[in-house]
Amino acid sequence: MNRPPDVPHSQVPPSYGFHCVLPKQDFAQALVRVTAALKAEGFGILTEIDVQATMKAKLGIDGPPYRILGACNPTLAHRALSAEPDIGLLLPCNVVVREAADGGLVVGFMDPVAVMQMTSNPEVAAVAQEVRVRLERVRSALA
């Protein structure tokens, strides 16, 4: 995706996701806030990957705080899995919380509609649309 020359790459949403930028705040508190906003929309956290700790442990590289949250709405996941059993290959929805270069925080959301376009199943597409709406409400609640 091309970006305008005056817009940093980190501020241009990729075609496979969307994000919001939070002001500088404690990373742990931001994780709690993001998790609570997801819960309000029916999502639970199935996985949490601490990328910063993993890079330090495996490669000896110090990096900024970076977490990948595997978010799942059980009702919607059940609908998608019932419509297409192998859709689990594309689940759960990843939400990234990371520190930006300026010290603020970026919360990125996988766009389920973009990801689920790999299937032509209309029920999966309908579920993906509903998931996107809920994730966009999470983004709005955080902004």
Describe the function of each predicted region.
Residues N2-E41:
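Terminal, regulation- and interaction-focused segments at domain boundaries
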Residues P14-Y16, P65, L91, G103:
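A generic structural signal for well-ordered coil/turn residues at beta-strand boundaries
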Residues L31, N73, R132-L135:
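Short amphipathic alpha-helical/adjacent loop interface patches that line ligand
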Residues T35, Q52-A53, E136:
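Short glycine-/small-residue-rich flexible loop motifs, especially phosphate/cofactor-binding loops
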Residues A40, A57-K58, A141:
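Residues at alpha-helix termini
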Residues G44-V96:
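Compact, glycine-rich, soluble single-domain proteins
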Residues V96-S120:
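Beta-strand/loop substructures that line and gate deep hydrophobic ligand-binding cavities in soluble
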Residues Q117-A143:
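Well-ordered alpha/beta subsegment
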